[in-house]
């Protein structure tokens, strides 16, 4: 095979390694730095409106409204954090029971502060604890949603210490509950809470002014999280504050980025607000779970992200505050908002966007810049999953379909490679004839390519096509909850996690765990073997250095993919296998000898010769 072709293959392999490293070590940090610079520049040009000490945007002076009191404060737990059970026992509660959720609403404060996901567990063991999303104040990591009204001239308003009464003991789909509180000064508050069979709460706050004077109130809702959680994104997906704020579009702030924002409102508080927003949502997102405050999609509001330092703890908050509601004596007002608290299931998120009209709610799932590849990839995998009932089988079928889709391109590539093999004797003669003149050798080679209608870089297309598919599948496996704990066959019980076996302990035969830094399971080894076989379908490069690179490349990729999700490794091994079969058929059809076995024999013969030489010396 000619030097041009071998050089190109070497470049492709090394480029893939460089691309992976560049994405992780350079592109991610550079993008984060650029976002911070843009945020700082924009903050310098715009003075944000005031906020309460807890991050709920208070009316700015230009609105002519009063300063707002401080909702959302957390009572300090005497003696430090307490157990979850002890914290839950501090308040009477309304139980939450749905097909997807369990938990409770605290009547003291009227918060949704106890939510567990019934269909998701911490590990692949179905008996392991359920995922806990919300936890009440007083625990080690409080995380809750709060709703209500703020205002300065309205007298006592509901706070986190307000004890509400409830007309029911259990909140379930089709069975809402109504919370009531009378402030004793002419205002009666009602909160009607409903929930569907998935993860959406609907909260309707009503207030009736039985007093003699007019008042002005502002409805608000917020999601508050105490303490910085462990993030898993590694620049592959966003975790932290997220929102779609009307014309300002998608806004994403990592926890570290939010801490670098300018001072915002109250003491020890940093953050950013957007005023005059219509449509969208604000919230806090993890890899698989999220909580979002969703205002009425047709009513203007102010959205904000804040980071308040409370001693040694950071309090992260995403909040919305509606415009002023002027309430005359004898009048009443209603504010309806929603709360999403649950798993980021693709179809559920999309249905909420469509059925409830939540603008761009699908952005809650981070499909990345190449969403136009990632989304169709997930759709295809999901379609075949519902057909076969196994995401691993779905990966195999989608890979096969992609092979069929790109069959014309691959055929042209392999036909060109077959022709190139057929002219190997002529190319060898050219190298011998012009061995002292590199330029003439290249000119004669290109004339031969032109005469035989050979494209010297045609063999690159199968590899180039595989790269975007590889990254799209990696993204899908990493971000979508549907892939979490999705089993294959045998020992693969989670396609989104690395192969749990390891060659270090002989795949579990030896009684000790394998170290993480040498994680090399069965499937990465299978992938390495298929890659080795695929490379041996072609003759070895004449350059000894290039031949060594080609020999060690499968080994490098085997170790590199050892810590990658098993689903990705299975895809690569299956794709290599299909490529070998396809190349074999095309070569035989074009009358070209398949040199696989000859190349394998020569490889091991060289290895034995090297050992023999070393022994003699």
Curated annotation (Swiss-Prot):
> Composition bias, kind Low complexity: at what positions?
61-81
Q: Which domain of life is it from?
A: Bacteria
- Report keywords, A-Z: Cell inner membrane, Cell membrane, Chaperone, Membrane, Protein transport, Transmembrane, Transmembrane helix, Transport
Subcellular compartments? Cell inner membrane
Note one Pfam family from the annotation: YidC_periplas
Q: Which GO terms describe its cellular component?
A: plasma membrane
Fill in the subunit field for this protein: Interacts with the Sec translocase complex via SecD. Specifically interacts with transmembrane segments of nascent integral membrane proteins during membrane integration.
UniProt cross-references to PANTHER family, sorted A to Z: CYTOCHROME C OXIDASE ASSEMBLY PROTEIN COX18, MITOCHONDRIAL (PTHR12428:SF65), OXA1 (PTHR12428)
Q: What is this protein called?
A: Membrane protein insertase YidC
Protein species of origin = Methylobacterium radiotolerans (strain ATCC 27329 / DSM 1819 / JCM 2831 / NBRC 15690 / NCIMB 10815 / 0-1)
């Amino acid at each position: 095979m000619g030097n041009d072709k071998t050089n190109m293959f070497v470049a492709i392999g090394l480029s893939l390694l460089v691309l992976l490293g560049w994405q992780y070590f350079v592109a991610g940090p550079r993008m984060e730095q650029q976002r911070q610079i843009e945020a700082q520049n924009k903050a310098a040009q715009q003075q944000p409106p005031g906020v309460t000490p807890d991050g709920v945007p208070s009316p700015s002076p230009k609105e002519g409204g009063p300063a707002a009191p401080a909702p959302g404060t957390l009572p300090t737990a005497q003696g430090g954090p307490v157990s979850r059970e002890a914290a839950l026992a501090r308040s009477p509660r309304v139980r939450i029971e749905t097909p997807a959720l369990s938990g409770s609403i605290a009547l003291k404060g009227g918060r949704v502060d106890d939510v567990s996901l019934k269909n998701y567990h911490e590990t692949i063991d179905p008996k392991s604890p359920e995922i806990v999303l919300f936890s009440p104040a007083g625990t080690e990591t409080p995380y809750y949603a709060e709703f209500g009204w703020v205002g300065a001239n309205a007298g006592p308003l509901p706070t986190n210490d307000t004890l509400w009464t409830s007309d029911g003991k259990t909140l379930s789909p089709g069975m809402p509950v109504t919370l009531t509180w009378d402030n004793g000064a002419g205002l009666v508050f009602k909160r009607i809470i409903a929930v569907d069979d998935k993860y959406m709460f609907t909260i309707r706050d009503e207030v009736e002014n039985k007093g003699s004077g007019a008042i002005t109130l502002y409805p608000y809702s917020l999601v508050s999280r105490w303490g910085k959680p462990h993030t898993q994104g590694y620049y592959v997906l966003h975790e932290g504050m997220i929102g779609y704020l009307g014309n300002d579009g998608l806004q994403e702030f990592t926890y570290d980025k939010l801490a670098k924002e300018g001072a915002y409102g109250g003491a020890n508080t940093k953050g950013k607000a957007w005023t005059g927003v219509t449509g969208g949502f604000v919230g806090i997102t993890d890899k698989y779970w999220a909580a979002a405050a969703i205002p009425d999609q047709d009513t203007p509001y102010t959205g904000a992200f804040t980071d308040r330092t409370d001693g040694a703890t950071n309090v992260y908050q995403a909040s919305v505050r509606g415009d002023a509601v002027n309430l005359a004596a004898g009048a009443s007002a209603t504010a309806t908002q929603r709360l999403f608290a649950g798993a980021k299931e693709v179809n559920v998120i999309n249905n909420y966007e469509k059925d409830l009209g939540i603008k761009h709610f699908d952005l809650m799932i981070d499909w990345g810049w190449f969403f136009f590849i990632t989304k169709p990839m997930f759709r295809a995998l999901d379609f075949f999953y519902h057909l076969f009932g196994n995401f691993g089988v779905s990966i195999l079928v989608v890979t096969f379909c992609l092979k069929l889709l790109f069959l014309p391109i691959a055929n042209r590539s392999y036909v060109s490679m077959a022709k190139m093999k057929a002219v190997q004797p002529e190319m060898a003669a050219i190298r011998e004839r012009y061995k002292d003149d590199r330029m003439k050798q290249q000119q004669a080679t290109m004339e031969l390519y032109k005469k035989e209608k050979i494209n010297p870089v045609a063999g690159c297309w199968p590899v180039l096509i595989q790269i975007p598919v590889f990254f799209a599948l990696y993204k899908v496996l990493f971000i979508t909850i549907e892939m979490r704990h999705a089993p294959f066959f045998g020992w693969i019980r989670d396609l989104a996690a690395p192969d749990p076996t390891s060659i270090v302990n002989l795949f579990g035969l030896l009684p000790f765990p394998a170290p993480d830094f040498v994680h090399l399971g069965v499937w990465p080894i299978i992938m390495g073997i298929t890659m080795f076989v695929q490379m041996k379908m072609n003759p070895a490069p004449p350059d000894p250095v290039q031949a060594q690179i080609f020999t060690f490349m499968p080994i490098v990729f085997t170790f590199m993919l050892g810590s990658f999700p098993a689903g990705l490794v299975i895809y690569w091994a299956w794709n290599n296998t299909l490529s070998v079969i396809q190349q074999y058929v095309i070569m035989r059809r074009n009358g070209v000898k398949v040199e696989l076995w000859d190349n394998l024999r020569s490889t091991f013969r060289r290895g034995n010769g090297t050992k023999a030489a070393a022994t003699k010396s």
